[in-house]
Swiss-Prot record:
Biological classification of the source: Bacteria, Pseudomonadati, Bacteroidota, Cytophagia, Cytophagales
Task performed by this protein: Could be involved in insertion of integral membrane proteins into the membrane.
Record flagged with keyword Membrane: yes
Keywords, alphabetical: Cell inner membrane, Cell membrane, Membrane
Protein's name according to its UniProt entry: Putative membrane protein insertion efficiency factor
Cross-referenced InterPro entries: Membr_insert_effic_factor_YidD
Family per record: Belongs to the UPF0161 family.
Length: 72
């Protein structure tokens, strides 16, 4: 199971390391959406973690709320 988690988390890590530093910061929440996804998958498993991350990404838009939103 840990290998499958690592495979799912790897693209998030690549984004955080290779792409995010060169993009304009646009996430309205703390932690960022990618950090939230990483933590949600580690804490809740792959299926629920991806579900929570997807819901979070859909909430992250210019007309939405902002602020501290930790993984529950």
């Amino acid at each position: 199971m840990w290998l499958l988690k690592r495979i799912v988390i790897f693209p998030i890590w690549v984004y955080q390391v290779a792409l995010a530093p060169y993009l304009t910061p646009c996430c309205r929440f703390q932690p960022t959406c990618s950090a939230y996804a990483h933590e949600a998958i580690n804490k809740h498993g792959i299926v629920k973690g991806i579900w929570l991350a997807g819901k979070r990404i859909l909430r992250c838009h210019p007309c939405g709320k902002s602020g501290y939103d930790p993984v529950q």
